[in-house]
A protein has these predicted regions:
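Thiamine diphosphate
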Residues: 1-134, 139, 156, 175-176
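Generic recognition of flexible, low-complexity loop/linker segments
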Residues: 15-17, 159, 259-265
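Hydrophobic alpha-helical scaffolding
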Residues: 6, 10, 28, 63, ...
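Conserved small/polar residues in nucleotide/adenosyl-binding loops
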Residues: 271-276
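Conformationally flexible catalytic loops at phosphate/diphosphate-handling active centers
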Residues: 54-58, 169-264
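Conserved thiamine diphosphate
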Residues: 125-175, 187
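Flexible, charged surface loops at secondary-structure boundaries
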Residues: 20-22, 266-270
Length: 276
């Protein structure tokens, strides 16, 4: 029997918050325009007792700054809890030091970003991609959406892919243009996505959690001869990411009927060759 589709009217921030709530056990938050409503939705749902995909209520903790939120994400991930945060602009820049650590330790998580101009000679709260482009070198994979429906679909891809690949993701979309655009979209629900989680990868993530009964040393100092080899070994994880993302795009397409791919081609191809 075909499941009847459910539609809602929402903006991009609500779509991202809806998906992230499903896959998160902890949300470390700090408000910054135009991402603030994502955290507000998650806080509201947690207070109302809404259950995530694991049948639990998300633990929401507001920190003293975006840097504190990123540090809380890092610590929570090390403790074996799936964790997320929401930010933009200078707030994202404050998270960069922890992003290097999260990516370097292959901790699966998603940062949801409503991309916004960075303040320079003056403050500007409107959208561009200066903030997310400042994070390309951190080791986070990136997914970008251009519509509210894409936010709903691709946010799910980001959360599913990060669990399987261990590579953290920045999931971003244009501040205001998409974050506050209100559209009628198809809603993905817990039962749609629960079966797509790689349970073995999730169990392995939890087994790697810091535990006083099974102590390990992490973040030690290394000499260059070892350090560069360990950095090179990371490439195996990153090389696997495109195939994993495409796999989950295909799975979401099966549920929704909307095609998603790593590359979508539009228009005509013009080929010219020199005269003989």
């Amino acid at each position: 029997m075909t499941k009847q589709k459910k539609f809602i009217t929402c903006d991009g921030n609500q779509a991202a918050a809806h998906i992230s709530y499903m896959f998160s056990e902890v949300a470390a938050i700090y408000p910054i325009t135009p991402s603030s409503t994502m955290a507000e939705y998650v806080d509201e749902w947690a207070a109302a007792g809404r259950k995530n995909i694991f049948g639990e209520t998300v633990l929401v903790q507001e920190m003293q700054s975006e840097g504190g939120a990123a540090g809380a994400v890092h610590g929570s991930l090390q403790a074996g809890a799936l964790t997320t945060t929401y930010t933009a602009s200078q707030g994202l820049l404050l998270m960069i030091p922890n992003m290097y650590k999260i990516a370097g330790e292959f901790l699966p998580c998603v940062f949801h970003v409503s991309a916004r101009t960075l303040a320079s000679h003056a403050l500007c709260i409107f959208g561009d991609h200066q903030d997310v482009m400042s994070c390309r070198q951190t080791g986070f994979a990136m997914l970008c959406e251009g519509s509210v429906q894409e936010v709903m679909d691709m946010a799910a891809v980001a959360h599913l892919a990060t669990i399987k690949s261990r590579v953290p993701f920045v999931n971003f979309f244009d501040g205001f243009r998409t974050s506050h655009e209100i559209q009628k979209i198809e809603m993905l629900e817990n039962e749609d996505l629960a079966g797509l989680i790689d349970q073995q990868a999730l169990a392995e993530f939890r087994q790697r959690a810091l535990n006083p009964n099974n102590p390990v040393a992490r973040g030690m100092a290394e000499n260059p001869d070892h350090f560069f080899q360990h950095r090179e070994s990371c490439n195996n994880f990153y090389e696997a990411v495109p195939a994993i993302v495409e796999e989950y795009m295909n799975e979401i397409s099966k549920i929704t009927g909307r095609p998603h791919g790593l590359f979508d081609y539009y228009g005509c191809l013009l080929y010219t060759s020199p005269s003989p």
